[in-house]
């Protein structure tokens, strides 16, 4: 008799939570609703996660691992400043588009009314991404001998705000307005402006 593959219950709970965030935009996810979606009791949920905040932390850990590991690959493999910036922004937008429910965590929508430390972790994640972008922009001077007329920190903040805005539009439109829509044309314009500065 063949054994059915063992389900990793923690991962299954997180997948269901992400799915509920996608299919129930604007609604608060309760542990009772999540337990029903997973097909277990609330007590069973708490055997895997001591609190709902820990469930959201599990999603945030997935976000951090996925984005930061890929960001490090971009930093290692690509040396051109503009291409690096483009790839970092594209990474954020594609990740958001492929994970609509998780986009609600990224923009803070799903964290309203939840533990403050969850929003703080997302803030820290975006601060790390902004630091990477700032580093990319600062390395332009070292690599090419030419910098920008505007402080790199200001430019990094502008680029990250662009990506965050696209993610927010995606969430606000209930996942209809794709973050990557018109990205190539928008990036061409942004790049032209950056190279002028």
Curated annotation (Swiss-Prot):
GO terms for molecular function: sequence-specific DNA binding. Residues 110-130 form a coiled coil. It comes from the Bacteria. The keyword Transport does not apply. It is found in: Cytoplasm, Nucleoid. Residues 30-49 bind DNA. Gene3D superfamilies: Tetracycline Repressor, domain 2. Pfam families: SlmA-like_C, TetR_N. GO terms for cellular component: bacterial nucleoid; cytoplasm. Its main location: cytoplasm. Keywords: Cell cycle, Cell division, Coiled coil, Cytoplasm, DNA-binding. Residues 7-67 form the HTH tetR-type domain. One of its GO terms (biological process) is negative regulation of division septum assembly. InterPro entries: Homeodomain-like_sf, HTH-type_Tx_Regulator, HTH_TetR, NO_SlmA, SlmA-like_C. Homodimer. Interacts with FtsZ. Required for nucleoid occlusion (NO) phenomenon, which prevents Z-ring formation and cell division over the nucleoid. Acts as a DNA-associated cell division inhibitor that binds simultaneously chromosomal DNA and FtsZ, and disrupts the assembly of FtsZ polymers. SlmA-DNA-binding sequences (SBS) are dispersed on non-Ter regions of the chromosome, preventing FtsZ polymerization at these regions. Belongs to the nucleoid occlusion factor SlmA family. This is Nucleoid occlusion factor SlmA. It comes from Shewanella frigidimarina (strain NCIMB 400). The lineage of its organism: Bacteria, Pseudomonadati, Pseudomonadota, Gammaproteobacteria, Alteromonadales.
């Amino acid at each position: 008799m063949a054994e059915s593959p063992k389900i990793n219950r923690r991962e299954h709970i997180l997948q269901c939570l992400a799915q509920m965030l996608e299919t129930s935009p604007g609604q608060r996810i309760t542990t009772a609703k999540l337990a029903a979606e997973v097909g277990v009791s609330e007590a069973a949920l708490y055997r895997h996660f001591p609190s709902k905040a820990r469930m959201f932390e599990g999603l945030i850990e997935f976000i951090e691992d996925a984005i930061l590991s890929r960001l490090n690959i971009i930093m290692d493999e690509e040396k051109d400043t503009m291409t690096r910036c483009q790839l970092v922004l594209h990474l954020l937008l594609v990740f958001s588009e492929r994970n609509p429910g998780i986009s609600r965590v990224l923009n803070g929508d799903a964290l309203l009314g939840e533990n403050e430390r969850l929003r703080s972790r997302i803030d820290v994640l975006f601060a790390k991404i902004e630091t990477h972008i700032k580093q990319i922009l600062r390395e332009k001077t070292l690599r090419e001998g030419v910098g920008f007329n505007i402080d790199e920190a200001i430019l990094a903040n502008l680029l990250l705000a662009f990506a965050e805005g696209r993610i927010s539009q995606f969430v606000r439109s209930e996942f209809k307005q794709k973050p990557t829509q018109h990205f190539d044309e928008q990036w061409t314009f942004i790049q032209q402006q950056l190279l002028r500065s």
